[in-house]
Amino acid sequence: MLLEAVYHRPKLNWCYAYDGHTIHLRIRTKRDDVTAVSAMAGDKYIWDQSMSYVPMHKLAADELFDYWECEIVPEYRRLKYGFLLENGPEKYWMTEYDFLKQPPENPDRLFEYPFINPADVFKTPEWVKDAVFYQIFPERFANGDPSIDPTGALPWGGTPERDNFFGGDLQGVIDHVDHLSKLGVNAIYFTPLFTATTNHKYDTEDYMQIDPQFGNIETLKKLVGICHERGIRVLLDAVFNHSGRTFAPFVDLQKNGENSRYKDWFYIREFPIAVQDGIPTYDTFAFEPLMPKLNTDNAEVKEYLLKAAAYWIEEADIDGWRLDVANEVDHEFWREFRRVVKKLKPDAYILGEIWHESSPWLMGDQFDAVMNYPFTNAVLDFFVDGIGDARNFANAIGKQFSRYPRQANEVAFNLLDSHDTARLLTKCDGNKDKMKLAAQFQFTYTGAPCIYYGDEIGMTGGHDPDCRKCMEWDEAKQDQELFSFYQELIRLRLKYSALRTGNLTFLSAEEGSANLVYTREDAKDKIVVFMNNAAKPQNIEVAVEEDSWEDIRSGEAISARLGALNIKLPAYGCVMLRVV
């Protein structure tokens, strides 16, 4: 047993309160090095009467490690614990201090979860577990009110450029809510709606005003009301890392320089502010001089931005915020942001844009979730780009899942493309079967899937600005078969809770193989998913305990033979079977 590989620490994702009564414990061991792990757990004040061994199950694995987990409901909301590691006859007891070959004589040097204090429990919005998001880039979704088109707006459907406009607005979304209801989505994520000079609106001019080319606050209220009547939640985009060049405090700074009362609203390295060899003398988003970075440690800046965060919840009843460039803003600002937002709307969804491992933001005091780009990369590598085999993919998924507490995984924002990337169908070189297979994993995985507008009807597009084409509303030019496919995926996900929050176990993910088999299981259902990520048909066989199954799409009855299911799949095929 390689003890050097064994890892655990209290709190974070290793020992945390899942709710007000339940504690999850996790421990890491070298892959395939330990055959069984148990938690020895009890109350520190009545250890002899309360201690018991709780078996742990293998939660996930990656290329180096196995991750084990168990759930404990302590009678008095506190826990003293250690671990028993077994590899056949070999046994070690792990304490906070050491590895022992005999059980510890007393609990003094074990790990401890002191008490489940309600204020410390990481609570995420329940509704997000059941959400299917649809991302809308407002300027390109639909033009519902030509009277508010920006000057120089082009006819709908032209070639997107970084600086052109087509007149998309909020009335256009209202006009096409039926499309969203028909598709089956129950949440919308809008890129920024506030006053700005660009078509993407990430250069905010006024955080308290809807951009006139999109409508006004009354239009937004109407849209949110219509969405809520249909069971659709609404998420807005906040750009609190930086403003735009026309933001009034920055305009004043440009005019008055070091004498501006707003000079401390930004990070100025040198006056007068200028751009020298392509580098501004003030901090910005990237090196973009038109997007000066805001000083969120400044009391006035903080007050203004938190007021904006509250305003749109109070006035328009929005359901949460997506936070742009979230990892470049200080943690203390986000802690205050969470307190303000959750006080107004406890089930508001706080989603950070972070493209990397995000544990520091997912400890219950800042975000509910992040945009799950490690998931995105793993899915695209395997299903789209053919990088790595099934084992590599399962390792990447296991590693990512093990990083966060379960409640954060359950509301993770799982996307495969967006306004920042090439479109999924384009990434698949137009191969719809590959696109569908990737989407089927997305919709049968823990977390909230998101469809980028137009993907459901076969829209294509390379990197920005090509991925921001005008939505195609001519039904003759829409891929209706693909639309039906997404409808069915959404229907199945919402029908079976196991596909949303059930435990995931890989039954087959072998080195050198393109085949993938995994189960999603909860108290209601057990579903096994077979995937063939190859360009030719494959027979896939996997051992199962149950005899009777049904195809959840067709309803066809399937029987296991000699303790195994044998499924023939076409190229890039997928079958989902449920125990009956």
Explain the meaning of each model-derived region.
Residues 132-134, 188-190, 234-236, 321, ...:
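Hydrophobic faces of well-ordered beta-strands that scaffold small-molecule active sites
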Residues 41, 85-87, 145, 191-192, ...:
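Glycine-rich, histidine-containing beta strand-loop boundary motifs that form or position
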Residues 139-142, 194-195, 240-241, 327-328, ...:
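Short, solvent-exposed loop/turn segments at secondary-structure junctions
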Residues 131-133, 137-186, 193-310, 314-315, ...:
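Substrate-binding/active-site clefts of carbohydrate-active enzymes
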Residues 1-133, 137, 143, 150-151, ...:
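Carbohydrate-interacting/catalytic domains
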Residues 139, 363-369, 410-417, 422-432, ...:
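Aromatic/acidic polysaccharide-binding cleft in carbohydrate-active enzymes
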Residues 27, 136, 180, 190, ...:
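Conserved, mostly hydrophobic/aromatic
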Residues 224-232, 242, 247-257, 314, ...:
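Active-site-proximal helices and loops of the catalytic beta/alpha 8
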